[in-house]
Amino acid sequence: MSAIQSTQELLQPIGFDTPVAESKTVLLSPGKEWRARIPAESKLTIKIVYGIAELFGTELANGVEYTIQCANIAVYSVDHVKLEWKSLDELETTVSPDTNMPYLYNLHFALEKMRLSSFDGPRILVVGKASSGKTSLCKILCSYALKSKAYTPIYVNLNPQEGAFSPPGFLTATPISDILDVESTMWGQSMTTGATKLHNKQPMVKNFGLEMIAENRPLYMEVLGQLAQTVDGRLKNDPLVRRSGVIVDSPPLQHLDESYTELEVAITKFNIKTLVVCAPDDSLAVELSDRFQTLVRSIVRIPTSRGICNIDDVARRALQRSQIREYFYGNGSTVLSPYTIGVDLLDAVVWRPKSSLTIDMSKTSPNMVELERVEVTAANLQHALVAITYAPRKSTAEEVFRSGVLGVALITEVNDAKRKMRILLPVPGRLPDKAMILTAYRYLE
């Protein structure tokens, strides 16, 4: 009996203590901002106990926990707010007055006045250098437009290094008809990801496929023009969207050429009327005014917020990886179930954009806007992100280039010997009989 007891004691499971994050409380008076920097592998959970608080313009519900990772956030208190937060990691947090909100309110009310005075809503282009708060401003303007009336502004992302309702590598235009997902690193989920907690958005997607605009400026401006054409079609067919307006988020100015040719193309193609400059002083606004005063009606400067954090290359890579992972697997509150399929290499037709990094421009003058065929091998496609187009598999390079993007897939494995590959799709089903475009982005699970 004692031997049996001793054996049972030996077989008892070993207890592991699950770490529990200690909840901390912050009291915010009206007009204050609570800021937190969340590293790539850390998570932050926040809850508004009482009061009215916003995260980049989206009001946070009382008593609801929000889990956020791989981001820098700023919770703005409209009213007296009690905020609880917890994290297993040590996070850098600060509380300070938000002196920028009066400027944002004035800009929002000016845009609202445009919507009320004309059937053609405001068309604005937000410009600035890297880490100037451009994207945060766009989120706030989109969210405030929804609060005013049942508007549906189109948000246009022209920065291929950051995804908006898509992984990085794409230019997108998305009608914003419902609140944004504050837990998402890419604004929210699109229709291709299936059922989610919040209303899915239906982005218009064009593939650029490269990381840097400088790798192929002619291609970038051609894709930008295609997206603008698609947006114009939506505006003509939807009076509500036309009245709501278009908010265009430009790439950082450091990524453009010295004469800002890409901005000129964006202003012309999207019929921009107002240039919003995010900068700490007037020098940039004056420079852009000299360059574009004949193309736009007005130029407005919004001061750079003191809470803006510089994003280095390591943080940007972490954000891109998080956006790719979220596209297929969801985030903390919305878990998605992607689907892996096996495909014969002979059934895959893959194209890719040309890059100045891989072409000797001194020996040849190729048509940089054309796509080139890719040999389906492990060396070219292993762990690659590919765009599945609407173009049939046997389409020409021109037809594939002009086609829109149906969805994004991840090639997880390529076996050259067996002539097979495995592809991760965001939804169950067979691989569409469509041509694919290889992007410069890779993701290793």
UniProtKB/Swiss-Prot annotation:
InterPro entries: Clp1, Clp1/Grc3, Clp1_C, Clp1_C_sf, Clp1_N, Clp1_N_sf, CLP1_P, P-loop_NTPase
Top-level taxon: Eukaryota
Keywords of the record: ATP-binding, mRNA processing, Nucleotide-binding, Nucleus
Keyword hit for Membrane: no
Residues bound to ATP: E33, S131, S132, G133, K134, T135, S136
Subcellular location: Nucleus
Listed GO MF terms: ATP binding; polynucleotide 5'-hydroxyl-kinase activity; RNA binding
Entry's Gene Ontology cellular component terms: mRNA cleavage factor complex; nucleus
GO terms of biological process kind: mRNA 3'-end processing; tRNA splicing, via endonucleolytic cleavage and ligation
Function: Required for endonucleolytic cleavage during polyadenylation-dependent pre-mRNA 3'-end formation.
Subunit: Component of a pre-mRNA cleavage factor complex. Interacts directly with PCF11.
Family: Belongs to the Clp1 family. Clp1 subfamily.
Protein name: mRNA cleavage and polyadenylation factor CLP1
Organism: Eremothecium gossypii (strain ATCC 10895 / CBS 109.51 / FGSC 9923 / NRRL Y-1056) (Yeast)
Gene expressing this chain: CLP1
